[in-house]
Structures are given as C-alpha cells and as structure tokens.
C-alpha cells in the first residue's frame, strides 16, 4: 500500500491505515519501535504534520504508545476487565483529568469510564481496558 496524494482520503488517514495494517499483520510486533517521525516522513514523502496526525490517531485507538525521548512503539495486547453493571448503575465515558491520566498511566486520547453505583458510589476505570456488561 502506498500513500496516494491524489486520493480523497486524507494523507494522515492513509498513513494510519498503512501502519495499522503492519501492526495487525505482525510486521510491527508488540513492543517493537516504529520508525521515527522523520523516517516516516521521508519514506512516504509526506509532511511531518501528517505523520504526527497519523501517530495521534493510532495512539487514540490504543495501538501504540509514545514517550518523549523513547519514541513510539506498538502496545502489547490489552486485557479487558469485564464489569457487570448492576441495576440502578449508570456509566459514562469522559476524558480523564491530568491526575487520572497520570495515575492510570493512560495515553493521551484514551477516555475513562465513570460508573455510578445505585448508592452513589463512583468508580473511574481506564476506557481502553474496560468492557461493560449489562445484566
């Protein structure tokens, strides 16, 4: 798959699709480092902003992690915790506070799930590691 600048699909989406395909095929295995922003830009002859946007998209999908000074790497497959909502409970997805992001070690763009129990108790769980089940 090549990046087609004449396509109606934005360049950053094309690059994200290409990288996602390589991750899903195992070409970029969990834990492996992705090429740098500069390398991807040069290899695909696209602007660095398009690379940044593609990386941000994949990060928001939970496929990759980035760290200043360490680069970008493929995340290990996440184990999801199954939470059964009890009658009278409610759940919403929202963006975490800075403190919640730090405490849960969440990547930017990953939401949290806030569950309110029938007695008003509140639980906040990482959205990329939680699956809600209705009874």
Task: For the regions a language model picked out, list residue spans one by one.
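Short, structured interface segments
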Residues: 69-75
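Residues in the helix-turn-helix
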Residues: 50, 57
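All-alpha effector-binding/dimerization core of bacterial HTH-type transcriptional repressors
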Residues: 75-135
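Hydrophobic alpha-helical segments that drive targeting, anchoring, or assembly
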Residues: 38, 47-48, 63-66
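Beta-hairpin "wing" of winged helix-turn-helix
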Residues: 28, 32, 61-69
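Extreme N-terminal segment that seeds HTH/winged-HTH DNA-binding domains in transcriptional regulators
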Residues: 1-46
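Short polybasic/polar patches that bind polyanions
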Residues: 24, 42, 59-60, 102
């Amino acid at each position: 798959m090549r990046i087609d600048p004449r396509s109606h699909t934005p360049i950053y989406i094309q690059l994200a699709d290409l990288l996602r395909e390589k991750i899903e095929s195992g070409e970029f295995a969990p834990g492996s480092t992705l090429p740098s922003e500069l390398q991807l830009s040069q290899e695909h002859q696209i602007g660095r902003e398009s690379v940044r946007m593609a990386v941000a998209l994949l990060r928001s999908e939970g496929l990759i992690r980035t760290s200043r000074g360490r680069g970008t790497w493929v995340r290990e497959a996440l184990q999801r915790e199954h939470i059964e909502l009890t009658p009278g409970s409610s759940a919403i997805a929202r963006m975490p506070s800075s403190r919640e992001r730090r405490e849960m070690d969440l990547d930017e763009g990953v939401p949290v799930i806030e569950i309110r129990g029938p007695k008003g108790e509140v639980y906040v769980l990482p959205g990329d590691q939680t699956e809600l089940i209705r009874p």
